[in-house]
């Protein structure tokens, strides 16, 4: 009699649904997954070790490159850790700017996550819509930092500079004619806050469009309802955070439970799922984008009425203004010392965590009083989610593995570090 054996296949790292460099070794019984073994490390760059050889501020750009879809949120956790070690008070305007850009980043992340998840399952229209909105928010990144992705905008003590009074303008080139440029620049005539206000007024309508495409779509529901079910007990035991935890019905959000910056002043709700499947996690992310839009609106209203400093007035931590530095020897010395030697952070250890779009992103920093971290440990939310891949995927069809990877919203910059 013939022996029936399971067979093993490699899913990725060249698979379009592997979201980067995931190598998944699947053991299959026919088309049913018996075991899923994630192999990570293909994007390991030694960020934690590199940080030990750089000054505290020089490591800020490394944070952008961890989860390279949620850039400013990574920076935020790192800056919070330094500020807690220093016992530094951040100006209130800088706190509002940080919260506003955290929520812009959350929208950016979820737009890409939902768009690519739908694309993986076979709904191509969605990703074309979401990239249209991402373009506007990337322009907001570019307006404050000059970069569309790796912004390096947050600093220990505040942010690099205040919000600009004018948006960057598109110009005619071989890809864009005069009419196209005129249309693109139409809502870019005012300040960044004007541009964002215009975006927030339009965005809920865009969310309705996405829901029209997916929420009641029969094929989308067949591919996501009842797939990748995680109970609340399992989610807690596996260390899930963010939409992966809230999709299972656990209302845990650091912005509400352990507020940082000015989140305690914000009016927003925490969307929570019921069934813990891929569909509920999708609904959570959709509603989170609407709530982020609410928070951005509140920040815009406050920032319009309250001008002020955007970085701490402590020249041992933040550089003096350029115009004062050029006329005062003492401030020139501060500037020189800060950019050559870097600031010295008092001895101690601290853990700072924020509600990152993917979950709890934490930075555990240890200082020995030098100008460089003694040790930096990064807690990436996607690491715990991917570790549960075997448990979640077992018993599903091979086609459902794609839906499960999409709902995890994994990015390997942060998982491999």
From Swiss-Prot:
GO terms for cellular component: plasma membrane. One of its GO terms (molecular function) is NADH:ubiquinone reductase (non-electrogenic) activity. The gene is nuoD. It is found in: Cell inner membrane. SUPFAM superfamilies: HydB/Nqo4-like. It catalyses: a quinone + NADH + 5 H(+)(in) = a quinol + NAD(+) + 4 H(+)(out). It is an enzyme of class 7 (translocase). Belongs to the complex I 49 kDa subunit family. The keyword NAD applies. Its EC number is 7.1.1.-. PROSITE patterns: COMPLEX1_49K (PS00535). InterPro entries: NADH_Q_OxRdtase_suD, NADH_UbQ_OxRdtase_49kDa_CS, NDH1_su_D/H, NiFe-Hase_large. It is a peripheral membrane protein. NDH-1 is composed of 14 different subunits. Subunits NuoB, C, D, E, F, and G constitute the peripheral sector of the complex. NDH-1 shuttles electrons from NADH, via FMN and iron-sulfur (Fe-S) centers, to quinones in the respiratory chain. The immediate electron acceptor for the enzyme in this species is believed to be ubiquinone. Couples the redox reaction to proton translocation (for every two electrons transferred, four hydrogen ions are translocated across the cytoplasmic membrane), and thus conserves the redox energy in a proton gradient. Its main location: membrane. HAMAP family: NDH1_NuoD. Pfam families: Complex1_49kDa. This is NADH-quinone oxidoreductase subunit D. NCBIfam families: NuoD, PRK06075.1. Keywords: Cell inner membrane, Cell membrane, Membrane, NAD, Quinone, Translocase, Transport, Ubiquinone. The lineage of its organism: Bacteria, Pseudomonadati, Pseudomonadota, Betaproteobacteria, Rhodocyclales.
